[in-house]
Amino acid sequence: MKKGFSIIMAFVTVMTMLFSGVTFADDTNENTESKTKECNFTNLIVFARFSDEDEFVDNEYSGNSVRKITDNSYNNADFNVSDYYETASNGKLHMNSVYLFDKGGSIQLSHPRGYYAEYSDENPEGYTDNGEKSQRMYELKTDWSEAINRAISAGNVITNYDGTKKYNFSELDKNNDGAIDAITIIYKNTTQSISVGWSSPLWNYKDYADYVKINADGKTITSKNYVQVTNSYNYLYKDNRKNVILPMAVATHEMGHILGFKDLYNSSNSSPVYYMSAMAKHMSPVPQFISVKEREAKGWLTSDNVKTIYQNGQYTLKEASTRGDSQIVGYKLNLKGTNKTLYLEYRNFGTGGNK
């Protein structure tokens, strides 16, 4: 990841309040808007509001619009989702997030927000049982999918966050497998009194929906994996260049699911892995690394990075670094008679230590 990210990981607890945001201790002057390597994975971001809600993409928080804060968090700040995975992948994944707007704004869904939430005295239109809940979760997928299809049919194209750069729809399928690499649906933040619980339709989660169909250079590409999130703009952070960003933990964790990583916790919040992976108990605002085992399983680390121990001896292991992995970052030991493997890595979560 870029220099700024490695520094903020070292000083994630050293912050000072600045107006309504937070400024990170950081000394980088690198302009991260200039990507040095060609993208090989595209994340399509679509802002969505419900039928009872007004436009929000240009609402400002700490002097920045929602669309700009989002792009800082995914693409351009000194620490962002794209750079996180470029570093975690050992330089193998180069992600770019692009946008689909409807006449410059968000897509609008056909139902109010409360329709997709649990019934209560304050929300009489909500679902009342698990059957209705499942049906409305399905309806939510088709709701935003159909809104995307309508926006594209109306002539809207994919662009950067402010519409000044256009992209061909073929950019959405970088590996040419006929599927959109990733879709991120970002719902409008809400002040409504609506209950959003674990596994409910409005929860932040990754799922599958194949209802978006796009013609790209004469072939059809289809949606598959997507994530949906609802961001709060109550607590924002700033890098050294005054880029305002969201806490990155949720966006990074959910993107991990798109890439194939599993949750390392359960619904009772039991998390044996705890802070050893961003897929378990992720830190905020900048999440820690995913584990050596996960990165190895993905093919991001090789036998040059994770060495197998075959004999007794003295082995040296340095702290996990955010500056790239050209050296050994872990060891593994096959435990005789157990069909299990013990992974060893050095993670320092103390102040000033790499995460």
Protein language model annotation of sequence segments:
Residues 188-354:
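Extracellular hydrolytic enzyme modules, especially secreted metalloproteases
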Residues 83-219:
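Active-site-proximal segments of metallohydrolase catalytic domains
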Residues 51, 68-76, 87, 150-158, ...:
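Structured segments of extracytoplasmic/periplasmic soluble domains
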Residues 1-7:
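Positively charged n-region of N-terminal signal peptides that target proteins for export
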Residues 31-69, 189:
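Fold-level signature of zinc-dependent metallopeptidase catalytic domains
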Residues 39-44, 93, 178-183, 274-275, ...:
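Loop/turn elements at helix/coil->beta-strand transitions in domains of secreted/extracellular proteins
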Residues 17-34:
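Sec-dependent signal peptide cleavage junction
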Residues 54-102:
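Active-site-surrounding "flap" and adjacent substrate/cofactor-binding loops of secreted or lumenal enzymes
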